[in-house]
Regions:
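C-terminal motif of bacterial Sec signal peptides marking the signal peptidase cleavage site
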Residues: 3-6
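Bacterial signal peptide processing site
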Residues: 8-12
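Post-signal peptide N-terminal segment of mature Sec-exported envelope proteins
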Residues: 16-37
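Glycine-rich, compositionally biased intrinsically disordered regions
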Residues: 17, 47-53, 160-169
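Short, solvent-exposed coil/turn segments at beta-strand boundaries
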Residues: 31, 43, 118-121
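Short beta-strand-to-loop capping motifs
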Residues: 37-42, 127-130
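Structured domain cores in non-transmembrane regions
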Residues: 43-113
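Extracytoplasmic electrostatic interaction patches
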Residues: 84-171
């Protein structure tokens, strides 16, 4: 039995090796216009939410909005978004089979559900601000490098940790 699969990509989700700083709105429609820190999230849905809730002991209160943190005794805030960007393709073989069957037998499409396929890719998108700067990830921000260092460490800790309660005792 020979099986041939032919797909045409309609949209390909971005691959981010470590992290990326970009305009939120450019990364995905509906995100803020500010600069954001983006990384791929290989964990299950709501894992980052649970991690932040536990790490900052927020008890479910304002977990994804205006989370305060300190860098060199200065208070910053971050908000985050769990974003899905699917890779979408058209599968030609099922489409062609349905066309052939429809012409030969006047049948309704049999493989209609297989005409397209989607594979979800999840990302964590973080924006940072403080009382004096609306966009701490902007190249013009005096805090950009400090904030980037903090976010890199936060990402590294999140990805390396399975039991988030350990973080409370570590900090």
């Amino acid at each position: 039995v020979l099986l041939v699969q032919s797909c045409i990509p309609l949209r390909i989700a971005p691959t981010i090796k470590d992290y990326k700083v970009t305009k939120g709105k450019r990364f995905k429609k509906g995100l803020p216009k500010k600069n954001v820190f983006v990384f791929e999230d290989p964990k299950d849905a709501d894992e980052f939410y649970n991690y932040i809730n536990t790490k900052f002991q927020l008890n479910g209160y304002y977990v994804d909005v205006q989370v305060p943190f300190l860098i060199e005794d200065k208070t910053y805030y971050f908000s985050f978004y769990e974003v899905e960007i699917p890779t979408k393709t058209i599968n030609l073989v099922p489409l062609m089979l349905d066309v052939a069957l429809a012409k030969a037998t006047d049948m309704e499409p049999v493989f209609e559900d297989a005409h397209t396929s989607r594979k979800g890719n999840w990302y964590i998108v973080i924006e940072v601000f403080n009382d004096t700067e609306k966009d701490c990830l902007s190249e013009a921000s005096v805090s950009q490098q400090l904030v980037l260092s903090y976010l890199r460490d936060l990402k590294k800790e999140y990805l390396a940790t399975d039991n988030y309660d350990e973080i409370v005792f570590k900090n």
